[in-house]
């Protein structure tokens, strides 16, 4: 028999979590092969915030994930993967080609380490759907309605200016609505400079 494992608030009622970020297609050579030697790849999905949502759901926490994916087989498969792991995806946006012209799902290649050989990751996420979507269309107040906890990371704002604006607006809305906010800085030097990350995090601090 399965049991829920709610994270409790001060009044002992379970919290509802929402995370925002990019979910990506993960391609991995089987049997610890190196990418340069691979003739096939195993497909799965992942992403920092998506993994958090999945981990919470696997521990019985009411967990929701918000992102933008292209309205095609890859995007729908990513949503299906989340739902199969008990993550709520009601707010997810499946974008049209008009809304996100490149119509891409971000991809990364994972070369799994073996023994003393470290794992390696190659990202192919430029012009993904989440980086091209106009988030001014989203009613953030309605999106966060009914949630108690918002989790964000420093990866999403580093992806593109529209994502940066989304995270700031999301933080302001969460503050206004009284949500608890957790923020994982998670600096990625391949996405933006240390100075850009510092300035952004400084702007975020009043809302965390």
Model-assigned labels for residue ranges:
Residues 1-2, 147:
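Non-catalytic pre-domain segments flanking phosphatase-related domains
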Residues 2-4, 129-137, 191-196:
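Short gly/ser/thr-rich secondary-structure transition/capping motifs
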Residues 2-90, 114-116, 133-135:
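Glycine-rich phosphate/adenosyl-contacting loop at the front of the ribokinase-like
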Residues 10-13, 142-148, 173-178:
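Glycine-rich phosphate/diphosphate-binding loops that line cofactor/substrate pockets in enzymes
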Residues 19-20, 91, 123, 182-183:
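General beta-strand structural signal in soluble alpha/beta enzymes
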Residues 38-40, 65-66, 125-126, 157-158, ...:
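Short, contiguous strand/loop micro-motifs
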Residues 62, 66-154:
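Conserved N-terminal subdomain of the carbohydrate kinase-like
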Residues 149, 155-208:
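Conserved beta-alpha-beta core of the PfkB/ribokinase-like small-molecule kinase fold
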């Amino acid at each position: 028999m399965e049991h829920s494992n709610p994270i409790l608030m001060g009044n002992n009622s379970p919290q509802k979590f929402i995370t925002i970020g990019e979910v990506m297609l993960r391609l991995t050579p089987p049997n610890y092969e190196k990418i340069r030697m691979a003739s096939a790849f195993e497909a799965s999905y992942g992403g920092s915030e998506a993994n958090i949502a999945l981990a919470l759901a696997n521990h019985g926490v009411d967990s929701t994930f918000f992102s933008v994916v292209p309205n095609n087989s890859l995007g729908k498969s990513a949503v299906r993967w989340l739902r199969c792991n008990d993550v709520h995806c009601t707010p997810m946006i499946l974008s049209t080609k008009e809304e996100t012209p490149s119509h891409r799902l971000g991809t990364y290649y994972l070369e799994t380490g073996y023994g003393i050989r470290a794992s390696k990751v190659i990202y192919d996420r430029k012009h993904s759907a989440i980086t091209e979507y106009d988030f001014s269309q989203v009613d953030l107040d309605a999106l966060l309605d009914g949630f108690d906890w918002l989790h964000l990371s420093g990866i999403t704002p580093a992806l593109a200016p529209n994502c940066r604006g989304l995270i700031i607006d999301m933080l302001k809305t969460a503050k206004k609505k009284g949500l608890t906010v957790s923020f994982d800085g998670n600096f990625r030097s391949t996405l933006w400079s240390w100075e850009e990350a510092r300035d952004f995090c400084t702007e975020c601090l009043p809302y965390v």
